[in-house]
Amino acid sequence: MSLKKSPFFELRSGSVDTLLFTVKTTDLDALRTELVKRFEATPEFFADDVVAIDVRRLADGERVALADIRQMLNDVRMRPVGVVALATQGWAGEAGLPLLEARDRRVSAAKPADEAEPAPVVAEAVAAAEPAPEPAPTQISASGQTLVIDRPLRSGQQIYAKGDLVVLAPVSHGAEIIAEGNIHIYAPLRGRALAGVHGNHDARIFCTCLEPELISIAGIYRTTENPLPADILGKAVQIRLEEEKLMIEPLRLT
């Protein structure tokens, strides 16, 4: 029997990059504490990203309450869409989330060098129905290195630098650039810029055209719900912290 191709939709095999939240402990109180600690400095980093819960690292015989983990992720504004489990972990299908098959292609999420390794968030390819084209996945630099971006960043794209970040092209509305060090933007900033995300109060943001949705240093942020003054909006500026307050100052380039 042949099926006529529909002009309205089609179903076919495909894959989509998403995040895996890899669970390595059954102590949910400790997991919740570490999760909140990780995200409190950069609450916008994974906001509204889809994520699959990966329980393959648990020891034989261990199990966790997936409904509780699902709620934890919702609390930090992530969107759980499925579970990745071993064939022997039949209990993983009891949480009301679909079981997904992952093909490992890992990019480690940023973490402070002096921290013990908590449950990591990693990017992997997860089998799913093919959606509309998605923005490119997060790009993460090697520890301590300056990351240079010379292409425009579209809405939904995220860049994370473990050192300083230099951007040579526009950052569109809905795009997000994050650095543990300083951020230099030699183009319009219309999205979000977060510097010093692990508590570096000496970090600064330098920008040649400031039109942001959000700016932040060491977790202290400002949105443009309160309009920026005319003498800095669209102008070259530097942004720094002074006594826990963001200071936005004109940047003299000549």
Swiss-Prot record:
- InterPro entries documented for this protein: CAP/MinC_C, MinC, MinC_C_sf, MinC_N, Septum_form_inhib_MinC_C
Q: What single Pfam family name could you report for this chain, choosing any that match?
A: MinC_C
Annotated GO biological processes are: cell morphogenesis; division septum assembly; regulation of cell division; regulation of cell septum assembly
Per UniProt, subunit arrangement is: Interacts with MinD and FtsZ.
**PANTHER family given in the database record:** SEPTUM SITE-DETERMINING PROTEIN MINC
**HAMAP family, from UniProt?**
MinC
Query: What name has this protein been given in UniProt?
Result: Probable septum site-determining protein MinC
Species classification? Bacteria, Pseudomonadati, Pseudomonadota, Betaproteobacteria, Burkholderiales
